[in-house]
Amino acid sequence: MTGEQNEVGTDIIMDIIDTFTNDKKGISLVNGCAGTGKMVVAISIINSLMNTLDIEEDSVGEFDDDIDKQKIAALKELKDYILKERNGKPFKIGFVLPMPGFRRTISNVFKECGNGLVKDMVIGPCDVVKEDYDILFVDESHRLSKRKNLTGYGSFDSTSRKLGLDPNETNQLEWVLNCAKHVVLFYDQYQAVKSSDLTASEYQDTLNKYSVNLNHHELKTQMRCKGGAPYIEYIKAIMNCTNTAFKTIENYDFLLFDDPNKLIEEIRKKMINIRYVKQWLVFHGIGKQSQVKSLKII
């Protein structure tokens, strides 16, 4: 965890404390573009919450970093609340992932991790009505859907009606907000790409409907791309046609193809790079996927 991620995580824990100690509903909205570590923050907070009762009374003094001290102090406060107000009953937590493929992956990660993380925590949007949740985390909340161009209208309609909502008027974000006392949303409006995804205005309108206590947070540091935030902003400017001036960025190539086959060929050439060796071998007919599973990246 970076200092920024740790700070946002600690602030969200404080949001949760405020929600429960003041017996109100609360929302934490975390904005961050791709590669800023939203998933890392989500899992870290969930892990901390699941192990809150194991926090020792004198553990604050073990840390030199102020953020770590604040986080432990917040968790101790939360522990006191759980012991006194909930008779030691842990929070019921759900981790909503809208995308089925990614949901299966994270479910397996939780299964292998243990330490309070269990695969049943990882759920889809339709599952929020199946349990009484205290806290719901939603990764990629920009992928929450409305009733448009779906593969399963039946499950959408059924879930909506269970909550007393009109299927034609509601959306999956509204489901989530109805099903927990505190909701933590990780959001990037630029990653809403399907016609079924909520638009930025639809998302905001839904929040306005429920956000009596809305806390804003932001992850700014780009962790996935060497070019960092300036590179991301430059690409956004190009895609939005707000910056037409050519800019040379060190260690990056800009290639324009008029033949998709040449684009694919160039990508395959690059796949010899680290972590893509398996795919490169398969693409070039050197072996089947099953034959290169044991290949080690050096």
Language-model-detected regions and their locations in the chain:
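Conserved helicase/translocase motor-coupling segment
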Residues: 196-199, 211-234, 239-298
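Inter-Walker segment of RecA-like/P-loop motor cores
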Residues: 86-136, 142
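Hydrophobic anchor at the beta1->P-loop junction of P-loop NTPases
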Residues: 30-32
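Signature of the SF2 helicase/ATPase Hel1-core->accessory helical subdomain module
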Residues: 135-216
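Hydrophobic positions on the alpha1 helix immediately C-terminal to the Walker A/P-loop
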Residues: 41, 45
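N-terminal pre-P-loop "Q-motif" helix
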Residues: 1-26
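Post-Walker A helix-loop "phosphate-sensing" segment adjacent to the P-loop in P-loop NTPases
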Residues: 48-59, 89
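Conserved lysine of the Walker
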Residues: 38
